[in-house]
Amino acid sequence: MKQWIILVIVIILGTGVFYTVTRTEPPITLKELATQPQQWQIKVPDTTASIHLTSIKQLQQHPYLMGEYQTPDGADNTTIYLDINQAVQQGKYIATSFVTTNSGSGTFYYLSVFEQHNKKLENLTNVFIGDRINIEKIAIVNNNPLMIKIDYKTHGENTPYALPADVAKSQIYQLKNNQLVLQQ
C-alpha cells in the first residue's frame, strides 16, 4: 500500500512539473522564425481571409517570407512579402511590416502585430501605412500598453511615384483592443 501511495504522489508531481514546463516555454526567437515561414499566418488586407506564408524569397539582397492569396472567384491574386529583416520582438509580441502586390501597379505597405501563443503566431492586426513607401525602422517603444514607432519615407505632394520616396515621416501606434491606433 505504501508503494502505491508513493507511486501516485510521483505521478501527480511529475504531471505538475510537466504542465508547468510546457506552460512556461519561452517564445520562439526571431532568428528561428525567420527560417519558418509556415509559422506565420497573416490576415489578407481588405478580405476576411488569412493565409500561411509558404516560402522564403530573396528581394533586394534580403530574405522575405512570402505567401499568396487568390480571391474565391479567381479574379485577383495577392502576393504578401513579410519583411523579417525589420521585425522586432518584445516578449510575446512581434512587430514588422509586410508588402502586398496584386494585378495593379501599387505596392502597399502595412504595419503588422503578431502575438505568440504556445509557439504559434497570431496576427492580431495590420494597418495600412502607404503605397510605394520606404520603411526605414520599426521599434517597440513601450510594452504595456504595446506602442510601436515606424519611421518611413513617403512621396511628397509633387513627387511622382516613379521616383523614390523623399519625405521622412514617423508615426506611433498603440495596440488597443487588438487594433493599431495612431497616436501621433
What are these regions, as identified by a protein language model?
Residues 2-87, 177, 183-184:
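Terminal domain-start segments
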Residues 88-99, 145-151:
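Acidic/hydrophobic-patterned starts of short beta strands in beta-sheet-rich repeat architectures
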Residues 101-106, 130-132:
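His-enriched metal-coordination microenvironments in redox/metal-binding proteins
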Residues 56-59, 104-108, 161-168:
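Short, solvent-exposed loop/turn segments at conserved positions within beta-propeller repeat blades
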Residues 120-175, 181-184:
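Short aromatic loop motif centered on NTY/YTY
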Residues 77-89, 137-146:
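Beta-propeller blade termini
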Residues 109-117:
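Short, surface-exposed beta-strand/strand-loop-strand elements in extracellular ectodomains
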Residues 100-104, 155-158:
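Short glycine/acidic-enriched loop and turn motifs that connect beta-strands
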